[in-house]
Swiss-Prot record:
UniProt keyword annotations, A-Z: Cytoplasm, Methyltransferase, rRNA processing, S-adenosyl-L-methionine, Transferase
Catalytic reactions on record: cytidine(2498) in 23S rRNA + S-adenosyl-L-methionine = 2'-O-methylcytidine(2498) in 23S rRNA + S-adenosyl-L-homocysteine + H(+)
Subcellular location: Cytoplasm
Active site: K305 (proton acceptor)
Annotated EC: 2.1.1.186
Gene Ontology MF terms: S-adenosylmethionine-dependent methyltransferase activity
A GO term from the CC aspect: cytoplasm
PANTHER family in the cross-refs: RIBOSOMAL RNA LARGE SUBUNIT METHYLTRANSFERASE M, RIBOSOMAL RNA METHYLTRANSFERASE FTSJ DOMAIN-CONTAINING PROTEIN
A biological-process GO annotation: rRNA processing
Presence of the UniProt keyword Methyltransferase in the record: yes
Identification of the protein by name: Ribosomal RNA large subunit methyltransferase M
Entry's family note: Belongs to the class I-like SAM-binding methyltransferase superfamily. RNA methyltransferase RlmE family. RlmM subfamily.
Organism of derivation: Psychromonas ingrahamii (strain DSM 17664 / CCUG 51855 / 37)
Amino acid sequence: MLGILLYCRPGFENDCANELQDKATALEVFGFVKTKRNSGYVFYQCYDPQQVEYLLEKLDYKQLIFARQLIAVKAFINDLPLDDRISPILEITRNLPLGGDLYVETPEGDDTKPLLTFCRKFTVPLRQALRKHNSLTAKENRNKIFYHLCFLDNKSAYIGFSVPHNRSEFYMGIPRLRSPSEAPSRSTLKLDEAIQVFLTAEEQQERLHSGMRAVDLGACPGGWTYQLVRRGLFVTAIDNGAMAQSLMDTGQVTHYTVDGFKYEPERKNIDWLVCDMIEKPKRVAKLMGQWLIDGWCKEAIFNFKLPMKKRYQEASEDIKILTDMFEKEDLQYELQAKQLYHDREEITLHVRLIGNHWGKQLGNG
């Protein structure tokens, strides 16, 4: 084994690398980073090859903010013969455990986008060859490792694997979503992606369903509200701006022209709080934390707008504000933070209080 490969948003390689380096150092797995600006990936080569699988086991994909995918790299080939790329790959994968599927990919970098067509065409013959050599299951099996072949050019590629329950299930780590024509803004895709990334299909059925109540802070014109309405929730939209009339016509939306930082709900039994306000992240962190601590909501999805520099440092500080608030109140919580595909200079968080109680108002709503 060589090291760990992460995909990330182009331009955020340093943030992704700093995060990975911090976590590897904390685990006493030492190595060095290989990447370049706008490449869309980070490779961490371990000094001790025996520690790669240990690092993979200890890293939690859900807790990596800037990573789109988490891959353990078996080998790097930079001289694949153009007339027979498959044979060298089969030689490497025969020493890997049985795989459940294959992703032939390329990072979302400026230099590699032209390779996507080749990757798709190469997938079928390589998958057939792997199955013929009993390296892949006859049908896709998501409980097995997935093989990843990450091309940097037409003859150079990382070869490795991801493990079940500790990876993105999406090709290239990117969910393919279509912007609904009736949505008031393209920001709707951010919440749609967040829901799919943070909650399983079963969790969505249990905790995000018709009849529930939500509050959308900074709702105008309604991109995030739309995602809640289409799932059958009743939404209180908070914004000094105007909401799309199409949403108001559903009868599921109540709009108040109030500052999101000053609004207090009359009913304290809100299932979901969502927030995409353009505001300093530390201020948003304190607001979200207080809503949860006071029992005004059960779960929240919200964004932190990041600065142009030291984004990993800023994100870490903002998340610590939240965790410190919860720990001071002795509250148990689940927290995930991800830079989603549809995020720009921002990250999206999901927070849920758990245990026998949530917030101060349980039973009083």
